[in-house]
UniProtKB/Swiss-Prot annotation:
<dbReference type="InterPro" id="IPR000568">
    <property type="entry name" value="ATP_synth_F0_asu"/>
</dbReference>
<keyword id="KW-0406">Ion transport</keyword>
<keyword id="KW-0812">Transmembrane</keyword>
<protein>
    <recommendedName>
        <fullName>ATP synthase subunit a, chloroplastic</fullName>
    </recommendedName>
</protein>
<keyword id="KW-1133">Transmembrane helix</keyword>
<comment type="similarity">
    <text>Belongs to the ATPase A chain family.</text>
</comment>
<dbReference type="GO" id="GO:0045259">
    <property type="term" value="C:proton-transporting ATP synthase complex"/>
</dbReference>
<keyword id="KW-0813">Transport</keyword>
<feature type="transmembrane region" description="Helical">
    <location>
        <begin position="35"/>
        <end position="55"/>
    </location>
</feature>
<keyword id="KW-0150">Chloroplast</keyword>
<keyword id="KW-0066">ATP synthesis</keyword>
<dbReference type="GO" id="GO:0009535">
    <property type="term" value="C:chloroplast thylakoid membrane"/>
</dbReference>
<keyword id="KW-0375">Hydrogen ion transport</keyword>
<dbReference type="InterPro" id="IPR045082">
    <property type="entry name" value="ATP_syn_F0_a_bact/chloroplast"/>
</dbReference>
<dbReference type="InterPro" id="IPR023011">
    <property type="entry name" value="ATP_synth_F0_asu_AS"/>
</dbReference>
<dbReference type="Pfam" id="PF00119">
    <property type="entry name" value="ATP-synt_A"/>
</dbReference>
<keyword id="KW-0138">CF(0)</keyword>
Length: 248
């Protein structure tokens, strides 16, 4: 009995060792780091930071085209946080929800628009950061830490009383739920991004470049939906943790 439980636990822990494609490894001391994640992640961050600087450099009371676009994005992200977390608590969490959404969107679009697998390197291959299970698991664990912090900061130790509500019989199920949340977030994002990259790469290799365009457009749409789902669920989990348990 206990042997099976340990095997199940080990399968969850070993999820970070899942490898798809040929990774570009950097060796630092005794550790091996996925270099393609660092390279493409920094490219995505540079693009996002550059857009943010360009969009906020010359702010005016009468917004121009680019400023209008940036304000639209900000209002969209504010609405996600406000609708899921609540009007009184959402402002503190806007930076986190916005960062999660924009990073995932940028990473997904990088994978959908750029055929990284066609770029030859002496060793390994480039890919979108969200094409690596380690990245998606890390993002999901950040969300787990965020909603634990939200619950403890709002309700103190009383936050853990939710595990025995509405009855102590549900304690194991409520504890298991906290493990399934990051797993579902990470695998959903990883699976969708990986599938999209593989489809685009195969079509690009088999047929002329114009044929895969509809697939790439569909990939952009699906990538945007995945970023929206991840950030919305993250905000929903935080909002759930901030609720007063046991209150009418």
């Amino acid at each position: 009995m206990y042997h099976k439980e340990f095997e199940l636990f080990y399968s969850f822990i070993s999820v970070s060792s899942v490898e798809v494609g040929k990774h570009l490894y950097w060796t630092i001391g005794n550790y091996r780091i996925h270099g393609q994640v660092f390279i493409v992640s920094w490219l995505v961050m540079i693009v996002l930071i550059s857009l943010a600087i360009a969009g906020t450099r010359n702010l005016t009371r009468t917004p121009q085209k680019f400023q209008n676009f940036m304000e639209f994005i900000l209002e969209f992200l504010q609405d996600i946080a406000k609708n899921q977390i609540g009007e009184h608590e959402y402002r503190f969490w806007i930076p986190y929800i916005s960062t999660i959404f924009l990073f995932i969107l940028g990473s997904n679009w990088a994978g959908a628009l750029i055929p990284w697998k066609l770029i030859t390197l002496p060793e390994g291959e480039l890919a979108a950061p969200t094409n690596d299970i380690n990245t998606t698991v890390a993002l999901a664990l950040l969300t787990s830490l965020a909603y634990f912090y939200a619950g403890l900061s709002k309700n103190g130790i009383g936050y853990f009383s939710r595990y025995i509500e509405p009855t102590p019989v549900l304690l194991p199920i409520n504890i298991l739920e906290d493990f399934t949340k990051p797993l579902s977030l990470s695998f959903r994002l990883f699976g969708n991004v990986l599938a999209d990259e593989l489809v685009v790469s195969v079509f690009t290799l088999l047929v002329p470049i114009l044929i895969p365009l509809p697939v790439m457009i569909l990939g952009l749409f699906a990538s945007s939906i995945q970023a929206l789902i991840f950030s919305t669920l993250s905000a929903a989990y935080i909002g759930e943790a901030l609720e007063g348990h046991g209150e009418e």
